[in-house]
Structures are given as structure tokens and as C-alpha cells.
């Protein structure tokens, strides 16, 4: 089996999907998880205004609406939380996403003071914090905020990881990679767009250029620029298609470099890193 085939199998990507079936699959998955854990009553998710959190948020909201209708338990709620660092440049996009999601509860936790305090505390030891490192601190503070809210509201944290992000390791370890449940896992980027289209999202919600937007020196840096490969190439690879040798090498290099992000902390029994 080729590495491409191994990755596709591991991530569970289909070459072609039925968008309605995948919507139902994700909603039912979220509902089953809460039914299995009756002490959980909420899902919490940070909403950035990008495609992934918009899709995951809408699926979570639909799951909660169905659970309330099926059980008569009005304590089932979806909590959408904005997590800006100061003022977010594309706040209007986040508000469009919230208008589409229509969450039961919408909160704002501004992470700027927490991030700046942690950065200052680390630098006080004589250890410089690079802009890239500070970007990861932002992602991890967002994770802390979501888990704090989940802890306050008997909840679980939803993650937005999907196949095109997972294969490249394009997430912060213990940051946006920290979550309890991943309703988009198995979908590539274009398939996520198909689900949003089926859900009736306006084009602006899925045509926006993807960006992690964590670095202040490079605001709004496009994912594709940071990765050195396009999402179209990543999606083609995940669908089993032939792409250029250069793009394939780039994708597979990211796969190898990001292996540690997909695993629990390394033990003496692990050898994948050797």
C-alpha cells in the first residue's frame, strides 16, 4: 500500500460524498455522544468566521435542536464563543457566521490580556517569545477558554479538525488541536464546502481565503502560502488523484512532520518518530 493510500485509509476520506448523508452522519454522531454521556448538556466551539468553525457550529446547533425536540430536555444547548485577540480585523465575517449558525448561546471571551500576560511572564525569565510562538500561545489560550466554558456548563469542546488540516498538521498542538469531538473528521476542504452549500450558507462563508491569522508580523497569512501547497492539491491527494510530484512531496513531508500532533505524548513503546 502506498503512503497516499495509507493516509486516505487512516483519515477515512471518500473520493465522492453525498453532502446530505454526511450532514446527517455528523449530526447523529454529535447526538449519540451526548446521549451516551447524560452528564453532558452543551457543546462549546470557538467561532472564527472561517469555513470550518462555521460548518461545525451549524452542525452542532442542528444536533442540539433535534435533541431538545426528541427528549424534551431544554438544557441541551450549543454555546458559540468568539475568542478575539483585541479587535479582530475580520469581525464582520465572524458575525456573518454567527447569523448563519444561530447558536443557542453566543459569548465573547477576549484573550488579549491572558496572552499578553503569559507572553510577558515568559519573557521576564529572559526567554524571548517569537511572533510565531506568541501565535501558538493565542491558540492555546483559546483552548483554555473553551474548556473553562465547557467546565462551567457541563459541556464538551468541539474541534474543527478535518482531513485537509490533519494531513498537514496545520493546527496548534494543545491549541485548536485540543478538543473532545471532531464532527468534520473524514472530510477534506472542498467536501466541507459542499456541506455548507447544502445547508444553505451564503458563498462568502465558504469562499473566504482560509487563514489561521495567528501571527502579528504576517496578519491574515493564507494557509496555502504557509503550507506551500494549495487546498485543491491537498483535496485531490486525499481523493486518490495524481498530483504533481512537488505537491505530493510537500504534503507527505507535512504528514511526517506532524505525526507527533496526532498522537498522545510519546512513550518508550512508541517508535514512529525514529
UniProtKB/Swiss-Prot annotation:
EC code: 6.3.1.5
InterPro entries: NAD/GMP_synthase, NAD_synthase, NH(3)-dep_NAD(+)_synth, Rossmann-like_a/b/a_fold
GO biological process terms on file: NAD biosynthetic process
Pfam short name (any one): NAD_synthase
Single GO term (MF): ATP binding
Residues involved in ATP binding: 46-53, 160, 189, 211
Taxonomy, superkingdom: Bacteria
UniProt KW Membrane keyword: no
Top EC category: ligase
Binding site for deamido-NAD(+): 140, 173, 180, 260-261
Positions annotated to bind Mg(2+): 52, 165
Keyword Methyltransferase attributed: no
Coiled coil: none
Keywords, sorted A to Z: ATP-binding, Ligase, Magnesium, Metal-binding, NAD, Nucleotide-binding
Catalytic function, reaction form: deamido-NAD(+) + NH4(+) + ATP = AMP + diphosphate + NAD(+) + H(+)
Gene3D superfamilies, sorted: HUPs (3.40.50.620)
Metabolic or biological pathway: Cofactor biosynthesis; NAD(+) biosynthesis; NAD(+) from deamido-NAD(+) (ammonia route): step 1/1
GO cellular component, one term: cytoplasm
UniProt similarity note: Belongs to the NAD synthetase family.
Complexes and interactors: Homodimer.
Role noted for this protein: Catalyzes the ATP-dependent amidation of deamido-NAD to form NAD. Uses ammonia as a nitrogen source.
The protein, known as: NH(3)-dependent NAD(+) synthetase
Protein's organism: Streptococcus pneumoniae (strain Hungary19A-6)
Amino acid at each position: 500500500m502506498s503512503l497516499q493510500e495509507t493516509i486516505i485509509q487512516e483519515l477515512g476520506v471518500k473520493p465522492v460524498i453525498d453532502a446530505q448523508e454526511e450532514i446527517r452522519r455528523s449530526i447523529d454522531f454529535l447526538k449519540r455522544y451526548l446521549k451516551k454521556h447524560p452528564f453532558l448538556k452543551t457543546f462549546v466551539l470557538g467561532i472564527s468566521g472561517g469555513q470550518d468553525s462555521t460548518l461545525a457550529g451549524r452542525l452542532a446547533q442542528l444536533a442540539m435542536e433535534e435533541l431538545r425536540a426528541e427528549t424534551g430536555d431544554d438544557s441541551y444547548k450549543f454555546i458559540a464563543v468568539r475568542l478575539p485577540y483585541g479587535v479582530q480585523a475580520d469581525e464582520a465575517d465572524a458575525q456573518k457566521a454567527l447569523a448563519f449558525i444561530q447558536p443557542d448561546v453566543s459569548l465573547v471571551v477576549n484573550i488579549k490580556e491572558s496572552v499578553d500576560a503569559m507572553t510577558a511572564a515568559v519573557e521576564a525569565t529572559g526567554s524571548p517569545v517569537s511572533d510565531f510562538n506568541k501565535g501558538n500561545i493565542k491558540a492555546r489560550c483559546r483552548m483554555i477558554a473553551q474548556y473553562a466554558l465547557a467546565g462551567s456548563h457541563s459541556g464538551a469542546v468541539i474541534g474543527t479538525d478535518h482531513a485537509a488540516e490533519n494531513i498537514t498538521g496545520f493546527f496548534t498542538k494543545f491549541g485548536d488541536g485540543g478538543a473532545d469531538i471532531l464532527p468534520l473528521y473524514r472530510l477534506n476542504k472542498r467536501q466541507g464546502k459542499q456541506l455548507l452549500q447544502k445547508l444553505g450558507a451564503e458563498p462568502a462563508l465558504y469562499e473566504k481565503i482560509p487563514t489561521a491569522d495567528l501571527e502579528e508580523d504576517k496578519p491574515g497569512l493564507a494557509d496555502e502560502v504557509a503550507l506551500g501547497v494549495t487546498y485543491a492539491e491537498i483535496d485531490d491527494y486525499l481523493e486518490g488523484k495524481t498530483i504533481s510530484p512537488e505537491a505530493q512531496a510537500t504534503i507527505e513531508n507535512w504528514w511526517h512532520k506532524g505525526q507527533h500532533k496526532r498522537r498522545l505524548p510519546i512513550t518508550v513503546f512508541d517508535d514512529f518518530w525514529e
